[in-house]
C-alpha cells in the first residue's frame, strides 16, 4: 500500500497546497463580508482541483510502469510480480484518489474557510472508521482479492468521503 500511496501523493500534495491556500482566501473574504467572492473562490477551486486531479490521473497511469519500476527494483534485483501488484493497487487507488480527492480538498477548503472544522473532522472520521476499515475488513474476510483489496478500499473510501463532504457542503451552504 505504501508504494502506490507515495505515487498518488504526487497528485494529492499539490491538491493539499491548493486546499490550504484556498481556505485562507475563502476565510479572508468571509471575514471581509464578501461571501459571494468566498463562494466564487470555492467553485474556482473545485475546477482547479478536479482538473489537476484528472491531468495527473492520466499522466500517472500512462507512466505507471516506469514509476513503479523504481519501487520494484531493489538491491535484490527487479521483482516483476511486486511491480504488477503495485500497479494493480495503484490503478484502483488513483481512480478514487486523483479527481475525487481534489473535489474533497476544495470542499475542505470551504469548510475550513468558514471555520467549520468539526464538519471536516466528521468527514475525515467517516473516511477511516465508516468507509475504510469496515470495507477492508469485509474484503479481506469474505473475498480472495488479497492485496488488491487495499486499492479497492482506498478507491471506495475516497469516493464515498467525497460524496459525504459534498453533501455536508450542500447542507451547510444552502
Predicted regions and their residues:
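Small-residue-rich hydrophobic transmembrane alpha-helices
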Residues: 3-58, 62-64, 101-123
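Transmembrane alpha-helical segments of integral membrane proteins
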Residues: 132-140
Amino acid at each position: 500500500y505504501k508504494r502506490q500511496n507515495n505515487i498518488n501523493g504526487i497528485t494529492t500534495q499539490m491538491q493539499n497546497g491548493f486546499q490550504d491556500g484556498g481556505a485562507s482566501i475563502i476565510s479572508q473574504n468571509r471575514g471581509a463580508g464578501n461571501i459571494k467572492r468566498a463562494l466564487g473562490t470555492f467553485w474556482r477551486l473545485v475546477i482547479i482541483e478536479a482538473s489537476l486531479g484528472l491531468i495527473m490521473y492520466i499522466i500517472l497511469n500512462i507512466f505507471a510502469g516506469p514509476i513503479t519500476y523504481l519501487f520494484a527494483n531493489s538491491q535484490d534485483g527487479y521483482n516483476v510480480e511486486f511491480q504488477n501488484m503495485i500497479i494493480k493497487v495503484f490503478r484502483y487507488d488513483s481512480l478514487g484518489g486523483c479527481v475525487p480527492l481534489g473535489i474533497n480538498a476544495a470542499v475542505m477548503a470551504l469548510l475550513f474557510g468558514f471555520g467549520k472544522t468539526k464538519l471536516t473532522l466528521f468527514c475525515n472520521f467517516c473516511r477511516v472508521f465508516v468507509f475504510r476499515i469496515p470495507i477492508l475488513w469485509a474484503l479481506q474476510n469474505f473475498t480472495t482479492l488479497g492485496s488488491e483489496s487495499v486499492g479497492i478500499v482506498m478507491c471506495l473510501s475516497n469516493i464515498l468521503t467525497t460524496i459525504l463532504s459534498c453533501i455536508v457542503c450542500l447542507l451547510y451552504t444552502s
